[in-house]
């Protein structure tokens, strides 16, 4: 038996082994039924410039450390910097590494922990270099997705809503690149995912077979953002439909000063939402995408751990 209300192996302390917490779940669960912690602009940990960091740095741990801390959804954004290369970006800011760095780390991690699954969101976040002649999606598909170096790394099955058993040891693509020739993962259809800007919205994906429910109100201030996150959490809590995909962003755009930096917002939002998740107990949350994933503020609950432990 699979489904949200049953798990053969989940315990109260999944987060005690964050490096392999998925291995303790019923592998008949669909990924949409699993509460998954994610990191927003996952590659921004490389930023050292103090000015750029105020608004563009959203993580302080590298990919492997995020994975070991339990993060399983990675928000990767890029720029086509050559006809055979995607550079990782946060908007216009180059994050000093290429997409291959993430894929190499994911490949290494999944070989060490073959019962885990990684969901990778892929999005073009800045204009291509003037010399580039191919589309962003074409470069991704030809030089990464179909690259023999990453053979068997990506989930390539036909199930629009795969189970953990089907995706163990693999990356499942969450496609924000627009229309695509890639026929597996979330957003695998010719129209791709139609993403509303600064909004809470619903849209059909995978040729109408899945309902994507998103909260991504990144221009909100603290109170309104917390309210938006909690509203989607409340909907997920009472929803047992496995074909509904909940993606809830806790991130807020920086105002450009230390007072309203991404770090400062996260220091307030993450503990508040962690408290809500803890109070809800074993309940569906969906996928929560956070800034400073794995960072714990003294005296407060760790949001990644609370998301993991909320799984049944």
From Swiss-Prot:
Keyword Lipoprotein: no
Record SMART domains: PLCXc
Reactions listed under catalytic activity: a 1,2-diacyl-sn-glycero-3-phospho-(1D-myo-inositol) = 1D-myo-inositol 1,2-cyclic phosphate + a 1,2-diacyl-sn-glycerol
EC number in record: 4.6.1.13
Location of the protein in the cell: Secreted
One of the record's GO cellular component terms: extracellular region
CDD domains named among the record's database cross-references: PI-PLCc_BcPLC_like
Domain (PI-PLC X-box) ranges: 27-176
Signal sequence, renumbered to the chain: 1-26
One GO MF term: phosphatidylinositol diacylglycerol-lyase activity
Pfam families: PI-PLC-X
Presence of the UniProt keyword Signal in the record: yes
Gene3D superfamilies documented for this protein: Phosphatidylinositol (PI) phosphodiesterase
UniProt entry keywords in alphabetical sequence: Lipid degradation, Lipid metabolism, Lyase, Secreted, Signal, Virulence
Organism: Staphylococcus aureus (strain Newman)
Source organism, top-level taxon: Bacteria
Main location: secreted
Protein name: 1-phosphatidylinositol phosphodiesterase
Enzyme class, spelled out: lyase
A GO BP entry: lipid catabolic process
Function: Cleaves glycosylphosphatidylinositol (GPI) and phosphatidylinositol (PI) anchors but not PI phosphates. Potential virulence factor.
Active site: 40, 90
Transmembrane spans: none
């Amino acid at each position: 038996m699979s489904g949200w209300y049953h798990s053969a192996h989940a315990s109260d302390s999944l987060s005690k082994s964050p490096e392999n917490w998925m291995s303790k779940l019923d592998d008949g669960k669909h990924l949409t039924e699993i509460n998954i912690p994610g990191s927003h602009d996952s590659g921004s940990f490389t930023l050292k410039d103090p000015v750029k960091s105020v608004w563009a740095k959203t993580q302080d741990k590298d990919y492997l450390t995020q994975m070991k801390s339990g993060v399983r959804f990675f928000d990767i954004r890029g720029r086509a910097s050559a006809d055979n290369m995607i550079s990782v970006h946060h908007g216009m800011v180059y994050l000093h590494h290429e997409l291959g760095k993430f894929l190499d780390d994911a490949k290494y991690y999944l070989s060490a922990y073959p019962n885990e699954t990684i969901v990778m969101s892929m999005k073009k976040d800045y204009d291509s270099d003037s010399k580039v002649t191919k589309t962003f999606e074409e470069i991704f598909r030809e030089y990464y997705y179909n690259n023999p170096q990453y053979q068997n790394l990506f989930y390539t099955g036909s199930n629009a809503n795969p189970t953990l058993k089907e995706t163990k040891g693999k990356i499942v693509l969450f496609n924000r690149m627009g229309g695509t020739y890639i026929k597996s993962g979330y957003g695998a259809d010719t129209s791709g995912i139609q993403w509303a800007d600064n909004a809470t919205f619903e849209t059909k994906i995978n040729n109408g077979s899945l309902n994507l429910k998103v909260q991504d109100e990144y221009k909100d201030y603290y109170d309104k953002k917390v309210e938006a996150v909690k509203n989607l959490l409340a909907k997920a809590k009472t929803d047992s439909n496995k074909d509904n995909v909940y993606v809830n962003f806790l991130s807020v755009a920086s105002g450009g000063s230390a007072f309203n930096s991404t770090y400062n917002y996260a220091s307030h939002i993450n503990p508040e939402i962690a408290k809500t998740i803890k109070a809800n107990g074993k309940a569906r949350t969906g996928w929560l995408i956070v800034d400073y994933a794995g960072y714990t503020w003294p005296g407060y609950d760790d949001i990644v751990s609370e998301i993991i432990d909320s799984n049944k």
